[in-house]
Every structure is written in structure tokens, then in C-alpha cells.
Amino acid sequence: MSSVLLFLLLLLLSGVSLSGCIRLGNGGYEEWRMGSATYIKESLGHPLNDGGGACGYGDLDIFRYGRYTAGVSGALFGRGSACGGCYEVRCVNHVLWCLRGSPTVVVTATDFCAPNLGLSDDYGGWCNFPKEHFEMSEAAFLRVAKAKADIVPVQFRRVSCDRAGGMRFTITGGASFLQVLITNVAADGEVAAVKVKGSRTGWIPMGRNWGQNWQCDADLRGQPLSFEVTGGRGRTVVAYSVAPPDWMFAQTFEGKQFVE
């Protein structure tokens, strides 16, 4: 057998696609890239379900992200810009640990996988820069690999997010500032820019405080609130009068959604 035929056979056995690309919304394409993945056992719990997480989502069931989620390394996280983005992931190049046929799973980036600079990149320092690594939920990991695996090589690519219902806006803040957590974002999943408008103001740009929490220094109490949200690929949606004039801090409101 020639070396070329042998190479192609190995690709097929490992489940690697020869097509290479997937169509994203707004005419974009993204190719498969190589990375790695580990997982957090459900029996150990997860910091997100205790109100933590670098994206600020807290309980993922409340915010409709479900069980197929992942923390991503700094090379992917982008200081929070990756929060809410969707990735298709499959285990490759490991006959022992990858599931047969290399099935895929789509995960949402909901947390940051912190580096461990005291360990080497290939032994414990999976999330050290510039590694592209996914620390997946157990449910997501078991869709592509066996539970006994500690770490597996994967291919991944950005895909559009499929969400039910509209974008959700959870309002917090105080007398001199407004903060909003934006969740359940379809299409890009990521949020690149946000503006807010009250009935007595123009559009006010908000800055990313952390994760998907956006903030501006303005007292907008007693005014209906509208939000302009720009996704990671430049598309903008305006959700008018999402919150009524009598809104209160810690309330969540649902507004317009990105549509492919």
C-alpha cells in the first residue's frame, strides 16, 4: 500500500473530515482546528452552579445553557469575549479513548479554564497559553470520548448557536451605575458591544465589566430600557423597551433575538 493511501486510511479511521469547513451565519466559514479536552465529573459539582464562573452566568439551567458546556483556555477566552459562543467538538487521533466514528457535540463557552504555570503544557497545564483547550462538562465529554480518558486530542470549530426564545437581560447595579448580564444569545452567541437607552436619554455605550456583564455609569431607574446588542461577527439587534419603567434590580427580561 502506498504511503498516500495509508495516510488517507488513517484519516478515515480517526474520523477526520476531508471537507474542512462549516457554514456560519452572515456568510462566514470556520475550519477545523486542533486542540485538547478534559472534563469535570458531575459528582464533583461545578463552580458555575454555585453562582460562579468567569462569564457570570451562574446557574446554567436557569440561563438555558443546559448540560453541554465548557470552560475554555485563555487563547480562546479573550477576556470574556468568547462567553456564549458555540463550538462543535470531536475527539480524533486516539483509537483507545475516542468514540467510534468521531461523533460531535456542540458546547457553549461558559467559563474560563485557568492556566497552571507550575505544570508543563502536556501534563496538567492544559490551559496554559497558547494551548486551545476545552474543560468540558461530563455530559458533553461523554458524547465524544470515553469516561476513563484524562485528556484527549480534539478538533473544534465555531458554529452558530441555536437558542430557544429571546435574548435575556438581567439587570443589576446601583444608584449611580447600571449593569446587565446578557444571556441566551443565538447565532454568534458572543456579544461584542452593548448600548442602553432610557426614555430620557440617548444611546449610552456600555463597557464589558467581566464575562457577559456590561456596565455604564448612569442612573436609569424609573425609565423603560432598550438595548442595542452587537454580536461577535458585527450583526446588531435592537431590543426596544425590554424593561418597563418600574423595573427593579435583579429582574430578568426577555427581548428580541438574533435570527439567521
UniProtKB/Swiss-Prot annotation:
InterPro entries: Expan_Lol_pI, Expansin, Expansin/allergen_DPBB_dom, Expansin_CBD, Expansin_CBD_sf, RlpA-like_DPBB, RlpA-like_sf. GO terms for biological process: plant-type cell wall loosening; syncytium formation. Induction: By gibberellin (GA3) and wounding. It is found in: Secreted, Cell wall; Membrane. Expressed in panicles and flowers. Residues 176-255 form the Expansin-like CBD domain. May cause loosening and extension of plant cell walls by disrupting non-covalent bonding between cellulose microfibrils and matrix glucans. No enzymatic activity has been found. May be required for rapid internodal elongation in deepwater rice during submergence. This is Expansin-A16. It comes from Oryza sativa subsp. japonica (Rice). The gene is EXPA16.
